[in-house]
Curated annotation (Swiss-Prot):
PTMs per UniProt: Phosphorylated on Ser-59. Phosphorylation decreases stability and activity.
Gene Ontology biological process terms in this record: axon regeneration; regulation of neuron differentiation; regulation of transforming growth factor beta receptor signaling pathway
Species of provenance: Macaca fascicularis
Stretches the record annotates as Disordered: 21-54
Protein name per UniProt: Neuronal regeneration-related protein
Name of the gene: NREP
Secretion signal span: none
Length: 68
């Protein structure tokens, strides 16, 4: 299995679907590497910082982050 951090894609060498799956996705959650969790937390923390010289106390709203 290969992980591409810049694309957020998991690639597996196993054929899909296999006999156990019978055309369905496997039960349970897919593995999420720690790098993705750490990056997501870092982006969230950075997004909540206010710009220097700003008196604004609320966090800015981010509309370009899409989670799926």
């Amino acid at each position: 299995m290969v992980y591409y951090p810049e694309r957020f894609v998991w690639v597996s060498q196993e054929p899909f679907p296999n006999k156990n799956m019978e055309g369905r996705l496997p039960k349970g959650r897919l593995p999420v590497p720690k790098e993705v969790n750490r990056k997501k937390n870092d982006e969230t923390n950075a997004a909540s910082l206010t710009p220097l010289g700003s008196s604004e106390l609320r966090s800015p709203r981010i509309s370009y982050l899409h989670f799926f």
